[in-house]
């Protein structure tokens, strides 16, 4: 994993 729903990575 890396990125959330849209285009911002957590």
UniProtKB/Swiss-Prot annotation:
Keywords: Disulfide bond, Secreted. GO terms for cellular component: extracellular region. It comes from the Eukaryota. Expressed by the venom duct. Its main location: secreted. It is found in: Secreted. Disulfide bonds join 3-10, 4-9. The cysteine framework is V (CC-CC). Belongs to the conotoxin T superfamily. This is Conotoxin Bn5a. It comes from Conus bandanus.
